[in-house]
Amino acid sequence: MTDPNQSLAKSFEPAAIEQKWSAAWEAMGISRATLEAGRPDFCIQLPPPNVTGTLHMGHAFNQTIMDGLARHARMQGANTLWVPGTDHAGIATQIVVERQLDAQGISRHDLGRPAFVDKVWEWKEQSGSTITRQIRRMGASIDWEREYFTMDPKMSRAVSDVFVRLYEQGLIYRGKRLVNWDPVLGTAVSDLEVVSEEEDGALWHIRYPLAQPDAKTGLTHLTVATTRPETMLGDVAVMVHPEDERYAHLIGQAVRLPLSGEADALDTAQWREIPIIGDEYVDRAFGTGVVKVTPGHDFNDYAVGQRHGLPQISVLTLEAKIADTAPATYRGIDRFEARKRIVVDLETLGLLAEVKKHTLMVPRGDRTGVIIEPMLTDQWFVAMSKPAPEGTRFPGRSIAEVALDAVQGGKIKLVPEQWVNTYNQWLNNIQDWCISRQLWWGHQIPAWYDEAGNVYVARTEEEARAQAAAKGHTGAIKRDDDVLDTWFSAALVPFSSLGWPADTPELKHFLPSTVLVTGYDIIFFWVARMVMMTLHFTGEVPFQTVYVHGLVRDSEGKKMSKSEGNTLDPVDLIDGIALEPLLVKRTTGLRRPKDAPNVEKRTRKEFPDGIPAFGADALRFTFASLATLGRNINFDSSRCEGYRNFCNKLWNATRFVLMNTEGQDCGLQECVGDCGPEGALHFSPADRWIVSLLQRVETEVEKGFADYRFDNIASAIYKFVWDEYCDWYLELAKVQIQTGTPAQQRATRRTLLRVLETVLRLAHPIIPFITEELWQKVAPMAGRAKGDGTESLAQQEYPRAVLAKIDEQAEQWVQQLKALVDACRNLRGEMSLSPAQRVPLYAHGDAEFLQAAAPYVQALGKLSEVKVYTDAAAMEQDGAGAPVAIVGENKLLLKIEIDVAAEHARLSKEIDRLRGEIVKCEGKLGNESFVARAPAAVVEQEQKRLADFKATLGKLEAQIARLPVQTA
């Protein structure tokens, strides 16, 4: 623990401080949730990361915001629960373990399901604590005693219970639907696990012969444009727009499907006929205006098929090879090899009209990179739009409808509000949710089958056997091989993590939770589903507010991806990393290994010396400053350096305060009412000013928390500490301590301590480590802590503005003082005086103010003296030839001996040079050819040079105008 009497170290070294306070906070139990009556409740759920994953920048950003909210609530006296958990992450975790086995020459099928699942559990135990250790490194004040894993027995029981109840309510069913199919993983995947990017492809124009030539036009065929010739084997129709004058008269007729001969694809006699249909889905301007319809392999075609009652033909196997339902000519061939053969055969038959280059969006599995195939398979679904039966909490209303009403009725608030439209649009167009996955790792679906295919859905195998026996079946039953979508268990977290289905005190206190902090990319996949499931099973909304933040991207706005080599590891930003290991990290696991040289080149340019250690506080402050309401967060690590400098500034300011208050009379026992020149405490305008500004900052910070504007919080704290407290008040305080009366000195020391102690409490939710370390030193001195090391800053009261302490008169006084000091500094700069060169300043104007301000101006302006005149003429005479500054009603003369003629000549020469540079710049920028052809950065640089030249010219012209008039 901190010894408050031990002097503060000379420099801020974050590593040791972070390690010390992480351990101390856990030992003190500062994050342990309380359930006290009469106190407000605050709850926040950690979006459960992959149990075997590692912390990425999105996690670190998200957790900075959540920790700021949790610490703020805790300091405001709320029963605060931050629920931690990790997700089993079915696909991601299974892939990792399968790759480990592949390296040993073993497949999961060699092991069998039970042994493979055991291997996954082993991997979970080995690596499962990595991410929680990394979360701790960020300073997250989480109640780790309540940590769950989505496949813990309690969580698994809740999952089974929900599945069974939904099935019994008729809201879960099994059916054949089109899903995203990853042929490498051999499972359905969610939309979130599909990445669609533009790729170069082709548009094949294929002639489909009309079953009967068109008597009206003599047309013998329709030309169909497609990007996927291989799926034409499963075509069941061609369609045109019903208002397309070229083809509308053909609706109801038929074409013969090329290459559809069952035994011989090229035998035209075997080709089957398919209808020509009309549908407004067709874009008349795309391709030829005629589109093939393949409901078994295209989501849009599936919807068309449903509207028109068309059959569904699957011509691909689950391994993405041509199936036995297709012509024998192509069976067993890989889909892309089949594409090549089909194109050749069409060309042979004279049915390939043309091939055009075409850019299209190609869906790929984010884990495998393989092209995703829409596939008709038997899957389990949750009915999203079906009315719930009697006996449920919302009978007659669908799950989606109830979730829509929760936001529209104001029970859930989305911040910013723009995301309400996104939420509503998705729920208004929702499809039934495919919840089954063809994996071995995950919650196995609680359904069993007998030999006749009858299904028994139950919480346990014993229950399933009892159901089977009740129906007269006494033979063996087999459990469904599939597991549930990871998002299914994640959707239950708001209530399952609090002990549901048991009726627990935690559910009473913390459901609904106060706020959910999440990226906009999972509004559909997680947020909406939590709303649906929580309302359906508890009648409560899962959370009162959803704070939707942007996604962390690199400094150029590109998505961070390990496969692209542009990721940053938050722990590397905290601890630092040398260049060589950083290069290894960034060039390993690239999606395109050939990109490694470019990634290395970019990394060497961006981080020539590796990444320095910034510490967790600097990283957190950077994240907070970037937390705007925009869609993207472009992360530039150079900003961390600025916030590391802020931490150093705060550290050094604290050292100054302690050195000037330790062992001194700080007036803490004096009554503040006993103030004034004759009292025990005499607060100056500067003292009252900094306290007044502090109230304004406290108000701004509180509004920032209320509005979830962490960027405003960070900005307010930064500006107050750096610009006002450090740059101005500490300098003014030095003067007061050196020249003031005992009452003024006591008041100054008291103000230094009390303002600093308040600032440390104010900034603690954003930068917890450094503020805790400094508070342990400052608080006892400020009379705010016992000083025995048993108290934590995290448990103190959060500052609240006292509006009565706002002193506009003092603010105005210091504003005038700042203007005087700035004017004096400008005069020194214009006259090129060195800091060591001390000269007198003559002043005339508001004599009372100038007299009071003189000690400050002398010290901060590095002057030998400040002489205040009541007679303007006398000042002009004494300061003849001195440079002048006018500040409001006050006139300042910097008494300096100069060679007027030489200075005039020097300034004139520089002015002439600048005018010449301006002419050159204006000539360049006035040249249309230069502006049009030069890179934007070059033009921008030239514009900046012109602006700088003009600004400098203005200063020099003002400076030469102030020189005394030369007489012959």
From Swiss-Prot:
One of its GO terms (molecular function) is ATP binding. GO terms for cellular component: cytosol. A motif ('HIGH' region) lies at residues 49-59. The keyword Ligase applies. It comes from the Bacteria. The keyword Protease does not apply. It is found in: Cytoplasm. It catalyses: tRNA(Val) + L-valine + ATP = L-valyl-tRNA(Val) + AMP + diphosphate. PROSITE patterns: AA_TRNA_LIGASE_I (PS00178). Residues 800-831, 898-963 form a coiled coil. Keywords: Aminoacyl-tRNA synthetase, ATP-binding, Coiled coil, Cytoplasm, Ligase, Nucleotide-binding, Protein biosynthesis. GO terms for biological process: valyl-tRNA aminoacylation. Its EC number is 6.1.1.9. Gene3D superfamilies: HUPs, Isoleucyl-tRNA Synthetase, Domain 1, Valyl-tRNA synthetase, C-terminal domain, Valyl/Leucyl/Isoleucyl-tRNA synthetase, editing domain. A motif ('KMSKS' region) lies at residues 559-563. ATP binds at K562. ValRS has two distinct active sites: one for aminoacylation and one for editing. The misactivated threonine is translocated from the active site to the editing site. Monomer. PANTHER family: VALINE--TRNA LIGASE, CHLOROPLASTIC_MITOCHONDRIAL 2, VALYL-TRNA SYNTHETASES. NCBIfam families: PRK05729.1, valS. Belongs to the class-I aminoacyl-tRNA synthetase family. ValS type 1 subfamily. Catalyzes the attachment of valine to tRNA(Val). As ValRS can inadvertently accommodate and process structurally similar amino acids such as threonine, to avoid such errors, it has a 'posttransfer' editing activity that hydrolyzes mischarged Thr-tRNA(Val) in a tRNA-dependent manner. This is Valine--tRNA ligase. It comes from Ralstonia nicotianae (strain ATCC BAA-1114 / GMI1000) (Ralstonia solanacearum).
